[in-house]
């Protein structure tokens, strides 16, 4: 039976209570900020140039030297940093999984708002939990990158793409916590 057919059979007296404007506005802001975090994280992972140290540019996907002319190597072993090739593979994988978890979390949040049924509260909670998982993966990738290149790291050496990933990770955390909090306020656990 279609959704229209189910609603047509529902008696008029059993209408679900409408959400307040404030609650809908907050949930919309959370969804919008998560979408921004997904875009920031995706661009940051795809570009991957995260650290400029002296005349070397370290990225998730390749390593470049910028002496007279820029020469890039896909073989990260050419950077002469122990464990960089294997470590960057792990950082890339964790970062990509963080983006995937954030996309699924965003999908759950949006579906819970578009299809208001008895399961929409569970969908909102699942979306928020997936955002927390995405935050953990994203911050783990950032931390792994910094640990791998700890000898080359300076605060001004981080590129815009690194700070995009950092901001995306922070936004994922804030929105996951906000999503769980607004859900606990509006729908107390039974």
Curated annotation (Swiss-Prot):
The chain crosses the membrane at residues 25-45, 96-116, 131-151, 155-175. Signal peptide: none annotated. One of its GO terms (cellular component) is monoatomic ion channel complex. Keywords: Calcium, Calcium channel, Calcium transport, Ion channel, Ion transport, Membrane, Transmembrane, Transmembrane helix, Transport, Voltage-gated channel. InterPro entries: Tmem37 (IPR029372). GO terms for molecular function: calcium channel activity; voltage-gated monoatomic ion channel activity. It holds the Pfam family TMEM37. It is a multi-pass membrane protein. Its main location: membrane. It is found in: Membrane. Belongs to the PMP-22/EMP/MP20 family. CACNG subfamily. Thought to stabilize the calcium channel in an inactivated (closed) state. Modulates calcium current when coexpressed with CACNA1G. The L-type calcium channel is composed of five subunits: alpha-1, alpha-2/delta, beta and gamma. This is Voltage-dependent calcium channel gamma-like subunit. It comes from Homo sapiens.
